Amino acid sequence: MSNAVTDTHALIWYLEDNPKLSDAANEVFEQCDRGEIVIYIPTICLVEIVYLQEKARISSDFKNQLDEVLAVGDTGLILFDLTSEVVDALAKIPKQAVPDLPDRVIAATASHLGLPLISRNHRMPLVGIPLIW
């Protein structure tokens, strides 16, 4: 398996051990935990996490827990910043195919890196991004 990019919901479901996460997605996260691959977290996922906390849709301390996981440094989870190259990739993703801006940024990150996306968003293959789900 190659490295991958994660969508926000997949990351949340993995860290919460939520059964909504597919077996294939769970296996990729477990490979990351074993140090076999890297999973990139687009920084917009952090924005979505704060938003979901504010809406009380996830634990109010989820972002702090994620920060602790990332700070330890023994994980294959790596933040990937929103760069001008990601913005250029975003411009190539049709708004009609992926109308939600955070989803477009996540898709653009995967496209820029040339990696599959861990997501259940079935619109992504329409723009040429392979899914792991």
Where are these regions (language model features)?
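Alpha-helix N-cap/helix-start capping motif
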Residues: P19, T43, S84, N121-H122
